[in-house]
Amino acid sequence: MNKSTKAERSKQLMSTLPGDDVRQVMWRFSDRYDLQMVVQSTREVARGLIANLVANGARNTHDWTPEKNSILTAFDEAGLTQVFMDPADGGFIEGPKNLALALVAYELAWVDGGAATSSLASNLGLSPIHEKGTPEQRSKYMRMAVPPQPGEDRQIKRGAFALTEPLPFVGVDTGVVSGKLRIDSWDDGQDPVFHVEKRGRFI
């Protein structure tokens, strides 16, 4: 099969993929305006900022750059950071969030798998607090991870997790993983806030 035949076949296959109207029925969110808006917001970020970063070679390094940091800001501005949160903590979706989070990852993965993964990283870091924390802990830490509201003078806190497992079972070579951990701040009567840097070869 030559290149033009492959390209034509790919084009035909792409035209057979279901559109938004069909997916909304298939995945049962045709009556969920909140989920439809999440899809639209995610698509705008994916096909705008993230597509430009990929086109400009941002994926060619594992170093954290200001350009990559702009993805998190775009997530905040589009409301994607709040998808995981309960309305009482600054979110906007009632009930289970799995479908909403899957839709976010799906739209981002069409453009860049790394962006899809990064959209879920903060949620993974917050999940233990969300699932096992006291109501006071959930309220405190989940609200810190939501972008500041108008009139609030604070920085958003990001949840994080570290994955270090031996090859060949996952995609991190632990032989070349290194990191630094320090206490960023620890106010009297408060829990410590850690600053973590991790470097490694990711496969």
Task: Please describe what each predicted stretch is.
Residues 137-203:
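Glycine-rich, Trp-frequent "lid" loop and neighboring beta-strands that shape
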Residues 1-120, 140, 144-153:
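Amphipathic, small/basic residue-rich leader segments at the start of a protein or domain
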Residues 120-127:
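Short, conserved phosphate-binding/catalytic loop or strand-edge motifs used
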Residues 131-135:
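N-terminal leader/propeptide and maturation segments of large enzyme subunits in energy/redox metabolism
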